Amino acid sequence: MILQALTAYYEQLLKQGKVEAPGWDSRFKVSYELRLGPDGQLLALNDLRQEVPKGKKTVIAPRELPVPHRVKRASGVAANFLCDNTSYLLGADEKGKPERSRQCFEACAALHHKVLDGVDSPAAKAILAFFDSWKPDTAPTHPLLAGQWAALNNNANLVFGYESPDGAHWLATTDDAIRAAWQSAFDTSDADAETARCLITGKEAGIARIHPAIKGVMGAQAAGAALVSFNAPAFCSYGHEQGANAPVSEYAAFAYTTALNLLLADRNCCQRIGDTTIVCWAENAAPAYSNAMLMFFCGGAEARGVSESDLAAALKALSQGRPVSFLDDKLDPNQNFYVLGISPNAARLSVRFFLHSSFGQFAKNLQDHADRLEITRPAFDKRENLSVWTLAQETVNQKSRDKNPSPQLVGDLLRAILTGGPYPATLLNGVTLRIRAEREVTRGRAAILKAYYLRNYPTELNKEVFTVSLNESSHVPYVLGRLFSVLETIQSVANPGINATIKDRYFNSACATPATAFPTLVKLAQKHLQKMTTPNEVHFSKQLTELMAQLPETGFPVRLSLPEQGAFEIGYYHQTQKRYAKKNEEE
C-alpha cells in the first residue's frame, strides 16, 4: 500500500509537470559546470552554487537541477551520465587511489560513448571528444581547475555544459538530442533484466534488482537508505536474490523513490519528531494539504504567515466536514490523504506507521486531541497548543544527559493522535514518574492526564473530574488534590519566603496514601492559621471546612489507585491555577 500510494503520487506530479519522466532525477545538487567547446576542450569551470537562507543567515549551497537517473553505488565502479564527481568526469581526486580514479574515468567514458555514439548534436560530439582527449593526470594542475581543486573534491558534483562558436551556451542536461539519447538508453536498460509481474503496477516488466536510495531521513546514512532491500540469505525466498524476492518493476521503483525523495526534500511535506521522520501528501498532490497538516500537527503556523486563530478556525471547519480556503488553495475534507512515519536503521528505513484516510477525518482526530488537551494554563504560558514533541518531553528528566523521549513512545503517540485511538500507557507511566520525582504538575502533565483518561476511560466520572478548569466535583481523590493545594497555600501565606513547602515532602504520600499524610497536614494547617491575620484566617478556614465536608465520614482513604491519583493531581493543578489566577487579578 505504501509503494502504491507513492507511485500514484509520482504519477500525479508527472501529470502536473512537477517532476521529470522516468530516467531523470528531478532534484540533484550540482556545484560546478564543466563548459566544453566544439572540439571537446575545457573552456571554463562555472560555479553553479547559490546563496540560500538557512535560519537567520545565508549559506552557499549547490544548485538543484534535473539530471539523468543516478545509479546506486556500493563499493564497485559505477558511472553516471552527464553529472558526477571528479573521479568519474576528470579521472582524478584526492583519495590517494590513482588506479581506481583511472577506472572510474574509463567507465564514465564508456558509458557516454554507449549512449552518445551516433548522436547528431554538437554538445554530444564535444562530450565524446572531451573523454577521448582529456588527460586525467593534468586535472589537479589544469589552469581552470587548480584554483578550485579543493572545492571540487569536497563532495562536489559536476555537470557538462556546451558553448557554441557563436557564444550560446547551455547545460548538456537540457540538450534535446542528448536527452532523447539518454531516454532511449534508459528505457531499454532493463531489457536483459529478470521479468515478473510487478507488485505495484500489476504488469509484466523488468524487475529492479536494487531499488534507488532514499535520502533526507535524519540519522540515516548520507548516501541514502533503502526502504526495500534484501542483503542476507535469511531474508530471501528459495531461488531468489535481491529485488526478485519482492518483484517491483524498474519503473515503479523509480517512481516511488522519486516521490519519497521529493517529499523528504520539501520542508512543507516533512517533519522530524524524535527519531521519526513524518512525510504526508494528498492524493491530488496539492501542497496546501501537507502544509496545513504539519501546521495542525507540529505548530509553526506564524512562521509560515498563518495566525493561530486562522489555523484553529480551519481545523475546526475541516473536522466538521466543511471545505475551507487555506494558503490560496481550497482544502476539501474528502480528499484522500496519507501520512508515513519512517525511522533510520543503519542502511535501511523502518516504517513506524502508515496511515490513510480522508483529510477531514485526520482533521477531526487532531481537533478531538486538541479538545482533550485543553486545560487552564498559567499566565506566563503563552502557548496556544501543545505539540507532540512537547507532550513527549513531559516524560523526560530535563536534568539528565539524554533529554530525548523514548522513540517507541513518540511513535505510539503519533499514531494514537492521528488515528484517534487510545493513548499509549507508556505516556501515562512516564508522566506519573516525572510527577513523583519532581513533585510538579505542569500544564503539559495535567493536559496529558486529562486527555489520557478522557480518551482511554471515557466514563461519566472522568468527564466530571477531568475538565478544563476547576470544578465542584465531589469525587474524593479530586477533592483531596484541591485540599492539598489549599494546605500548601496556607503554609506559604503563614510563612512568607519559605524555601520548601509541604509539596516537597508530602506530595507523593498524600497522592498515593492519603491516610498517612493528611492527618498530619491538617494539624499543621491549624498552627499556620493561628499566625495569620483575621481576614486570611477566616478565608482559609472556610475553604478547609468546605473541602473537608466533602470527604467521607470514614476518614481519609488508605490508598488511591493510579486513576484516582490522576484525579488527585488534576484537583491539585486546578486549585493551584485558580489561586494564581486570583492573585494575578488582584495585581
Regions found by a protein language model. Give the residues of each.
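Short, solvent-exposed secondary-structure capping/transition elements
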Residues: I207-H211, N268-C269
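Short microdomains enriched in Cys/His and/or Lys/Arg
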Residues: R209-N245
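Short Cys/His-rich metal-coordination motifs, predominantly Zn2+-binding knuckles/fingers
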Residues: T201-E204
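Conserved phosphate-interacting/catalytic interface
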Residues: M1-D190, F235-E587
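Short metal-coordination and nucleic-acid-contact micro-motifs, chiefly zinc-binding Cys/His arrays
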Residues: D190-A196
